[in-house]
Amino acid sequence: MFASRSSRRRGAVLGAVVAVTALALSACSTDSSSNVPGGNDAAEVSDVQAMLAGAPVADDALFTPGSTMEKIRDRGTLLVGEALDAPLLSQQDPTNPDDVSGFDAYLAQLLSVYIFGEPRVEIVPPASETREALLQNGTVDVVFNTYTITEERAEQISFAGPYFSSGLAVAVKADNDDITGIDDLGGKTVIVGANTPAVLAVPEEQPTAELVDFATDPQAVQALLQGRGDAYVQDYTLLASNAAANSDLKVVGQPFTAEPYGIGLGLGDTEFKDFINNWLLEIQ
């Protein structure tokens, strides 16, 4: 039976993550001059600090000899595959590189608190196509990166969770009124992220669409704004974050797939998976 050292109430921790991220979304939506969706507002900083201070910490008995958890704790830092350029999800403050804010970023910090009793995270930014390799070669311990659980990926790595559900959606330039969703992408040039579910999902919905893939989300957004594609298909959460940060973009229609987010970890590491799933239950 899993347990945690602290007896404080935990159920509101994940809710606090959502609330802090929503605060950032509100600030981002009302101030287009801001490059960073979180971390600069004093109230938000205070909320993040309170959230981390109230987070659960794992019992010593869970760190069994030879386990991944023990190795991480002995090392003294959690190595996380995590973006630095995803608004509202995981974005680095350009004026303070140590400040990374957003939903995935806060969850990674909470997991490190569960392991160490305080946030100790070292971020390794992945591209979409390198996430599995980073886990397979031990460069990172976990991946928090809007990481959709798929059968193909689950053959290469393991997933804890899911901890959130989203879906693929369509983004276009703000002045584009011709495309209103996936049904309008037949015969269009569609931008997708390399090694993302959109690579397979778009042809299934629109076989005549021409795909152009990019390694990172910022590259894909830039390509759309430069007119190198008619639309960008990506996870709705990421697209909505981009649109909130950039008034030249908009999301059209509704998500047309269901995409559960998981936490990536090494293939077959059942003990570590159970450890993380227990932590997810504690913060819900």
Where in this protein do the model-derived segments appear?
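Short helix-initiation/N-cap motifs at beta->coil->alpha
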Residues: V121-A133, D177-D178, V212-Q222, Q226, ...
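C-terminal motif of bacterial Sec signal peptides marking the signal peptidase cleavage site
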Residues: A22-A27
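A ligand-binding cleft/hinge motif common to bilobed small-molecule-binding domains
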Residues: T130, Y147-E155, A201-P203, L225-A258
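Short loop->beta-strand "edge-of-pocket" segments that line small-molecule binding or catalytic clefts
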Residues: L78-E82, D98-S101, I182-N195
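Acidic, polar ligand-binding/catalytic clefts
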Residues: R120-D184
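Extracytoplasmic small-molecule ligand-binding "clamshell" domains
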Residues: G38-D47, M51-V143
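Extended ligand-binding regions for polar small-molecule ligands
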Residues: S29, N40-F63, A105, N176, ...
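Periplasmic-binding protein-like
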Residues: F164-V172, Y236, A240-L281
